Structures are given as structure tokens and as C-alpha cells.
A protein has these predicted regions:
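N-terminal active-site wall of soluble small-molecule enzyme domains
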Residues: 1-44
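Short loop-to-alpha-helix "cap/lid" segments that border enzyme active sites
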Residues: 33-134, 138-160
Length: 160
């Protein structure tokens, strides 16, 4: 079976623990300003998000070193993730703290992924995984099954 991932952003630890016990999560994915101590306190593998915008990118090296994976996502002003907008992927190889993460191969990419750009991302940057949502919708909140199938086909073609 595929791993079950719970996605959280600055939630109280009690809330995360309750969701974990109900759903028996395999991974926790943190999108906020969660500390290393907080993330490790659940004794569950975790994915930590680094939000990439126009400002300097801050990377908590201890937190990222201990994460099972790092997720790179777009930040627009104060909105972290869920923007449907792609960040400048060249930062993955031009920004020093991100280069180190890329070298490990333990990273996922989110933010503005769609049928028009996914092949370029996969060929150029080779992420371990993808987090896609609005790029596969025909209207807000409604997934387009044809787009989803085509997207998966592109990913599988690049994975072989």
C-alpha cells in the first residue's frame, strides 16, 4: 500500500497526535514554522517544506538534515503553498542551501505544476516526488481526470 501522509501547518501537537492516531499516518508533512523539536516529537518520519519566494531562503539545516524528505513549494507574499504558481526552479541549483538538499535526492516539488511544465521539471531536476493540485483542475476544487491521467503518464515515462 502507498504511504499515508498527513499535511499540517502550525497545528497544536495535540491535534496532530489525534489525527495520527485516527488515520495511522506513515508520514507527517509540515508546511509552517514548526521547529525541529516539534517535528521529531511525533516519532514519525516527516517531510518539511521550504517555501521559495522572492526573498532570501531560510533553511534550518538541523531540521532539514533530519527530515525524511524536503518539499519545495511556492511562497507569494504571506501565502505559503496552495498558490497554483510555480517558483523559479533555477533556485534549486543556484541557491547554496538548496543545492545541498538537491544533492541528497530526498526532495519533492510543489507549486504550479501542470501538463505544460512537468516534463521540464522531471528531466532537469529529477525530484523524488511531486505535490500537485490546482494544475490538474478544470475549475477550482474539481480535478480533471484526463489531465490527471496525462500527468501520471508523463511522470511514469520520465521514471523509467
Amino acid at each position: 500500500t502507498k504511504p499515508l501522509v498527513g499535511v499540517f501547518m502550525n497545528q497544536p501537537a495535540q491535534h496532530v497526535s489525534e489525527i495520527m492516531s485516527i488515520l495511522r499516518l506513515d508520514y507527517l508533512q509540515f508546511h509552517g514554522s514548526e521547529s525541529y523539536e516539534y517535528c521529531k516529537s511525533f516519532n514519525t518520519p516527516f517531510i518539511k517544506t521550504i517555501h521559495i519566494g522572492s526573498d532570501k531562503i531560510f533553511v534550518d539545516k538541523i531540521l532539514i538534515k533530519n527530515a525524511s524528505m524536503t518539499l519545495f513549494d511556492t511562497q507569494l507574499c504571506d501565502q505559503k503553498g496552495g498558490t497554483g504558481t510555480r517558483f523559479d526552479w533555477s533556485k534549486l541549483i543556484s541557491e547554496q542551501p538548496l543545492q545541498e538538499i538537491i544533492k541528497t535526492g530526498k526532495y519533492l516539488v510543489a507549486g504550479g505544476l501542470n501538463l505544460d511544465n512537468i516534463n521540464d521539471l522531471l528531466v532537469t531536476y529529477k525530484p523524488k516526488g511531486l505535490d500537485v493540485s490546482s494544475g490538474l483542475e478544470h475549475e477550482t476544487g474539481k480535478k480533471d481526470h484526463e489531465k490527471m491521467e496525462r500527468f501520471v503518464d508523463i511522470v511514469r515515462t520520465n521514471d523509467s
